[in-house]
């Protein structure tokens, strides 16, 4: 006799329901076991040396205010978030602290307010890869930056660069991985599918998930790399122009501006180190030998001169002092050209602003604004490539030289245009000798911005952390 012949209907339904619950529970358990773990301390036991060296990036506590060092940049980014504040990057340990604390992300009161999109988390946390897996790319990118503040809580770490769920990783191998689908697509565009790359290329590509140029596109403001026409400054400039893309409209000149992110990968590729397959980890994450003979990759990403014998000395025969002098001289050359370009571009912005006031038309201004756009894009591309004076100084100097040329083109046209409007005297530039004076010249209410940010950090962020702790307690 079959079960259905002797089992009553209520019992049958109850049995079926119970079996479904058991099945759902087992599936959920399997999903939880397979979930990407964004917590860096979850890998301390199996990878102690790597974990503790990564945690040592917390030693870079000092914050360097780049706008105070160079107030020109306040004017160059007028109307954009970087004019509010721009601090030099610290260690990976502080990635989340820094993006939460910067004035650029504003002081959102709820998940639907604030100036920035969700994409601004994309390079800051392994939680990004987790959320994309769980919700899809649209489910991650959609909305404002504050929407998933309680989900993005672990700083840059293990699951950003490694397949931490793989058997190889659990056995002690690095098992490098691209953890953002938009990065995989970008490498496919330039014919460098990650799975087909050499070990050295993979080591560089993993870093290129973040140390790279990108922009926000579409209704969700999703991250995309502008590599469709190539990876040089000129290639990407053509790409952006073809799309008629702009990051913002300059508050003084009204030029349609581009903001370079941090194209370290692109400039490295063009420099002597990249061309000779000397990759990021060779200089910034060297293999080191412990007293007991154990060899591991040091995850305290930092200045190669701090570990000279394990980095530079592996290839170079010069002394540490000799190499430091070479690098310092290159840095000085790049800095000098940087300031030269800034002087010209700042003047062009104010002269363009004066032209508008004098009655210039959009048709008259269009070629001038395009020159300003190109000049500042090239300046920004060079200076935003952290360490470019070491990675590719010749690229930096060439690109900055073209920035000066484009700015000169704009100013030459402006002189002629201003003359037709009856303005023949030099345009006066306000006092921008300090960060505060430059921000005041733009009418920025810094006292209010800082007060709003403090309120956000005191009231909103603690709620994010509390919700995250409750969620992660279930892992």
From Swiss-Prot:
Residues the entry annotates as binding heme c 3: 92, 207, 210-211
Role this protein plays: Catalyzes the reduction of nitrite to ammonia, consuming six electrons in the process.
Gene Ontology annotations of biological process type: anaerobic electron transport chain; nitrate assimilation
Top-level taxon in the UniProt lineage: Bacteria
Protein name listed in UniProt: Cytochrome c-552
Annotated positions binding heme c 4: 280, 283-284, 391
Positions with a binding annotation for heme: 120, 123-124
Protein residues bound to heme c 5: 273, 312, 315-316
Keyword Electron transport part of the UniProt annotation: yes
EC number of this enzyme: 1.7.2.2
UniProt family annotation: Belongs to the cytochrome c-552 family.
List of residues binding substrate: 214, 262
GO molecular function: calcium ion binding; heme binding; iron ion binding; nitrite reductase (cytochrome, ammonia-forming) activity
Pfam families referenced in this protein's UniProt entry, alphabetically: Cytochrom_C552
Residue span of region Disordered: 38-57
Cofactor section: Ca(2+); heme c
Annotated binding of heme c 2, by residue: 158, 161-162, 299
Signal peptide: 1-29
Subcellular location: Periplasm
Matching CDD domains: NrfA-like
Any one annotated GO CC term: outer membrane-bounded periplasmic space
EC category: oxidoreductase
Reactions this protein catalyses: 6 Fe(III)-[cytochrome c] + NH4(+) + 2 H2O = 6 Fe(II)-[cytochrome c] + nitrite + 8 H(+)
Gene responsible for this protein: nrfA
């Amino acid at each position: 006799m079959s079960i259905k012949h002797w089992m009553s209907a209520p019992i049958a339904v109850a049995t079926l329901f119970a079996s479904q619950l058991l099945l759902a529970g087992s599936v959920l358990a399997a999903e939880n076991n397979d979930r990407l773990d964004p917590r860096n301390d979850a890998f301390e036991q199996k990878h102690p040396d790597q974990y503790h060296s990564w945690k040592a990036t917390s030693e870079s506590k000092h914050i360097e205010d780049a706008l105070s060092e160079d107030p020109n940049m306040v004017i160059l980014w007028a109307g954009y978030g970087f004019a509010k504040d721009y601090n030099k990057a610290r260690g990976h340990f502080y990635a989340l602290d820094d993006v939460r604390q910067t004035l650029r992300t504003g002081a959102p009161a709820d998940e639907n307010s604030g100036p920035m999109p969700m994409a601004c988390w994309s390079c800051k946390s392994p939680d990004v890869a987790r959320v994309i897996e769980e919700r899809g790319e649209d489910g991650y990118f959609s909305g404002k930056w504050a929407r998933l503040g309680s989900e993005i809580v672990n700083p840059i770490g293990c699951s950003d660069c490694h397949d931490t769920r793989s058997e190889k990783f659990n056995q002690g191998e690095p098992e490098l991985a691209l953890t953002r689908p938009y990065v995989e697509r970008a490498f496919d565009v330039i014919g460098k599918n990650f799975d087909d790359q050499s070990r050295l290329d993979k080591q560089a590509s993993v870093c290129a998930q973040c140390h790279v140029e990108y922009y926000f596109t579409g209704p969700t403001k999703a991250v995309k790399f502008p590599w469709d026409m190539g990876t040089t400054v000129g290639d990407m400039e053509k790409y952006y122009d073809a799309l008629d893309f702009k990051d913002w409209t300059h508050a003084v000149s009204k030029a349609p501006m581009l903001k370079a992110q941090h194209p370290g990968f692109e400039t490295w590729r063009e420099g002597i180190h990249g061309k000779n397959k000397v990759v990021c980890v060779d200089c910034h994450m060297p293999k080191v030998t412990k007293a007991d003979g154990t060899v591991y990759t040091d995850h305290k990403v930092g200045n190669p001169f701090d570990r000279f014998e394990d980095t530079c000395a592996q290839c170079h025969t010069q002394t540490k002092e000799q190499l430091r002098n070479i690098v310092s001289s290159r840095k000085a050359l790049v800095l000098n050209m940087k300031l030269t370009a800034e002087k010209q571009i700042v003047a062009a912005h104010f002269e363009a602003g004066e032209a508008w006031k004098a009655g210039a038309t959009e048709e008259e201004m269009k070629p001038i604004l395009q020159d300003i756009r190109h000049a500042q894009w090239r300046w920004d591309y060079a200076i935003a490539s952290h360490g470019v004076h070491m990675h590719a100084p010749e690229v930096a100097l060439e690109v900055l030289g073209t920035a000066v040329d484009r700015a000169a083109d704009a100013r030459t046209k402006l002189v002629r245009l201003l003359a037709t409007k009856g303005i023949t005297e030099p345009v006066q530039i306000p006092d921008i000798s300090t960060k505060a004076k430059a921000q005041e010249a733009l009418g920025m209410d810094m006292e209010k911005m800082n007060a709003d940010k403090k309120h956000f950090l005191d009231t909103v962020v603690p709620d994010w952390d509390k919700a995250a702790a409750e969620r992660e307690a279930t892992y």
